[in-house]
Amino acid sequence: MIRQKAPYRYASKTRLSIRRTDSGSAGCYVTVAVRGNQEFIIAELDSEIRKIRLKLTDSYEEGVKLSSGTFTLPARFCREILPDDVRSITILLEKSVDDWWYGSY
């Protein structure tokens, strides 16, 4: 995945960037504030209220591999978040008391 630079208005924000790859999957990037020292990340969608939540974990059984803030999710995830004519999106994230990061898309 090619890391893309976020628009200036998001430069200092805690965020998740999602980009549709050539294969249709979702190439994702989270900022340093989100990723911490864990090696895996869990991503969940609630399509009814259009929210995403992320949580870091040390368990490979629960999450996908996180490498320097980048990770890949299946194409169905990308189709849910990105309309057909949109290649990428930036979602601002906020940490909740339950240790999950939440954002709206």
Model-derived segments and spans:
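Secondary-structure transition/turn motif
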Residues: T31-V34, L54-V64, S104-Y105
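A short beta-strand-loop micro-motif that forms or neighbors metal/cofactor-
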Residues: I2-D22, R35-D58, D84-D99
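Detector for the mature cores of small, proteolytically processed
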Residues: K65, G69-T70, E80-I89, S96, ...
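A short, polar/proline- and glycine-enriched secondary-structure boundary/capping micro-motif
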Residues: F40, E61-S68
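Compositionally biased, intrinsically disordered low-complexity regions enriched in proline and serine
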Residues: R9-A11, V30, E61, C78, ...
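Short beta-strand-centered segments at strand-helix junctions
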Residues: D22-N37, S67-D84
